[in-house]
Swiss-Prot record:
The N-terminus is important for both membrane association and mitochondrial localization. It may also contain a RNA methyltransferase (MTase-GTase) capping domain. The C-terminus contains the RNA-dependent RNA polymerase domain and a structurally disordered region at the very end. The viral bipartite genome is composed of RNA1 and RNA2. This is RNA-directed RNA polymerase. One of its GO terms (cellular component) is membrane. One of its GO terms (molecular function) is RNA-directed RNA polymerase activity. RNA-dependent RNA polymerase, which replicates the viral genome composed of 2 RNA segments, RNA1 and RNA2. Does not need an exogenous primer. Also possesses a terminal nucleotidyl transferase (TNTase) activity. The TNTase catalyzes the addition of nucleotide to the 3'-end of plus- and minus-stranded RNAs, probably to repair the 3'-end nucleotide loss. Forms the open necked connection to the cytosol of the virus-induced replication vesicles. Mediates viral RNA1 recruitment. It comes from Black beetle virus. For RdRP activity. It comes from the Viruses. Residues 35-998 are annotated as: Cytoplasmic.
Amino acid sequence: MTLKVILGEHQITRTELPVGIATVSGCGAVVYCISKFWGYGAIAPYPQSGGNRVTRALQRAVIDKTKTPIETRFYPLDSLRTVTPKRAVDNGHAVSGAVRDAARRLIDESITAVGGSKFEVNPNPNSSTGLRNHFHFAVGDLAQDFRNDTPADDAFIVGVDVDYYVTEPDVLLEHMRPVVLHTFNPKKVSGFDADSPFTIKNNLVEYKVSGGAAWVHPVWDWCEAGEFIASRVRTSWKEWFLQLPLRMIGLEKVGYHKIHHCRPWTDCPDRALVYTIPQYVIWRFNWIDTELHVRKLKRIEYQDETKPGWNRLEYVTDRNELLVSIGREGEHAQITIEKEKLDMLSGLSATQSVNVRLIGMGHKDPQYTSMIVQYYTGKKVVSPISPTVYKPTMPRVHWPVTSDADVPEVSARQYTLPIVSDCMMMPMIKRWETMSESIERRVTFVANDKKPSDRIAKIAETFVKLMNGPFKDLDPLSIEETIERLNKPSQQLQLRAVFEMIGVEPRQLIESFNKNEPGMKSSRIISGFPDILFILKVSRYTLAYSDIVLHAEHNEHWYYPGRNPTEIADGVCEFVSECDAEVIETDFSNLDGRVSSWMQRNIAQKAMVQAFRPEYRDEIISFMDTIINCSAKAKRFGFRYEPGVGVKSGSSTTTPHNTQYNGCVEFTALTFEHPDAEPEDLFRLIGPKCGDDGLSRAIIQKSINRAAKCFGLELKVERYNPEIGLCFLSRVFVDPLATTTTIQDPLRTLRKLHLTTRDPTIPLADAACDRVEGHLCTDALTPLISDYCKMVLRLYGPTASTEQVRNQRRSRNKEKPYWLTCDGSWPQHPQDAHLMKQVLIKRTAIDEDQVDALIGRFAAMKDVWEKITHDSEESAAACTFDEDGVAPNSVDESLPMLNDAKQTRANPGTSRPHSNGGGSSHGNELPRRTEQRAQGPRQPARLPKQGKTNGKSDGNITAGETQRGGIPRGKGPRGGKTNTRRTPPKAGAQPQPSNNRK
């Protein structure tokens, strides 16, 4: 009834009612949408896009409804470990290279920390895994195959020094993934990027790397103000076809990124770490202006439009100062001035006014004021084009953890790049910290005062008796015979200088120095006796004993010093055959430093005392006293130190005595294994020994370590493996059962073959040719090693001096292999070439394809400085800083001790931190036997009495007065006073207790 009243006479049907409702709802919705859309066209309270309200509303609506946030949490500086990375090897750009390496590590670690994967653009050969975009544009790119992968969904786009060459940043940003770049973005218009010079010309950076390449490139303004940038969004082919209708009406897909940058590297302030974080993806009309404000990445224009020929760059310092760097295009001269000062100076009317104002501001440097005036006048000059000789590559440097050095200082040169990346390091022998750390690690920390048990002492006594055999009344060599045997040029020169003084008691002093040789840990110490009279005195006995006793028939099966390479090879092969290849290699750890005074007294000294006539015993004991207890000083630096009781490497007793200790340890192990056997039978089972190298029967593999510990020694044992050969005296026997062919220990050789320690005045080509010629004599058939040597000889030969000139140098054979001086070379047979190659592959862990590639590379090389380095998987460096920071196990509880010792030697007046006299004695025997030495060692009647000493340990200085002639203490060789800091305290002074070490 009510409806009828409202609608009149017309009555609606049931069908018409829903239609009416729908019509009304639709109209309402349309009105709502129109009002909502019209609301997008509202006038904002800030600047807005042009066009009419309809287009403005249309653009705003599309952006608002299609925006898709992208959430990525990434902060790479959480993985920053150091701001001053170091490189142990100076390849000409060690600092900038270390920064690049650190940046790569930082990027890798930060990506891994958030669970992402890396997608790198043209990575270097060190980065060989993962997805990548790798095109061949530089020669170095050929090291990896061409690839054009698609980034994964969790990928981080990485570029290290490659963004300059990108045609447009969108190729990196379009994937809508974080982008991380290590880039060069200078804050000055010329100068040095750490150790690499650069200039800017025509808005292009000309960057020249010492020991590397030269690069010319523009720079993107990643570090400009403005934190948001836009990019296109990459789509697949399928998406592109599906979105084609949208594109036809002018819609495009756009991504927005937030850009960050930092400069974390203290040594390279012009290097920046740039990373972008994607924020949103939207659709928008490309024919309607957008109101989203972003900056557009562009190339930096360094040219000053107001001063043709000049570059100008402004930057803000950490102290919020706005500075300006100005300099002429292509020139290295540049100056930096505060922006407000330059603005003021630019408005002056005369150059004189500019000079006056600069001086008034406190700028009195002529170079500084001249550059400002030249910029003021806009003076242009024509830059000369001249070749530049850049800093050569430097050897890898062993950098002790306690060193205070700012730059590496080594006395060695490279004549090619390293063959393997984990090459040996050269010690900084000119740094006293190097000497100090070597003393601690090779003397103090390993000092041994172990006294063996009665059973072990009895075994050692039996060994000495069997070693001496029937000899009991030997005579030493005469002075004349000994002089003839000491035939090294340096020895002959010293002997001629003291010929008239023969018979005078020699000085009791060791002068030590670091051996200038490549290695993987703290360098070895050569403890030399500077007085040739002492060497003459000792050699009379050691030479006679070796000739008659050690080379006697009953010792020839195990005593190998004095044999030539062919004899050694034959003996080793015979021993291995006798044992059916069941043999082990033995290698002592720091035998020189660990030999105890007990071993020296009861093995080496006892053997000679019992072998020579009784009238010579006092003289033998005298020189053994000196060897064991002699004081020492650093030859280069002058500080004195406790050398310990170990074997002194500069003594003529070193090799024969070490060989005897080596043999005694094996004899002890054999006795453990066969306690009921006759000693004579066990003695005949001792394997080849030479110094601290040895071969033994595998039956004592377990007991020989026990035997070594009984004497306080440490020993490494390795069982013979036919796949890797048998190593003895740094020669690898490839198959001792079938052939005498040997090769140099390949990994050890490859690590140091590129280095020379010859005098730097000798041309590098001469030094290189001399060195590789020696290796070609001993290893003419060794694969890879001989190929490398032939390459060096081929490329350096044309520029090297003539054979006659090189032969006239006394140091010609300095770096020749030792065995070339021993009447022969090691045997090698052509039919064993394949076997040699397989052993080399196993020992170096370089697969056969890579070995063949290196050999082919050596044969094709045109320049010695071409890149040849094979990347090693692991580093064997120890006690140093390597390219990745501190080498494993280099910093431990010994660090405070090393620092204490270094500080003590830097300040000789302070107390020695080693209360036990360097660790040479902790038990029953007094350090350095001062009480016995105060009375003077026993002397033979026919020699002048040895001078008396009153030696007492005082810190790191041994004070004492002697009756022998020589330079008085406190006086230099010319009568002048020496450094008072090195003057020892008076005899009898008491050492001060140390609070640092016990």
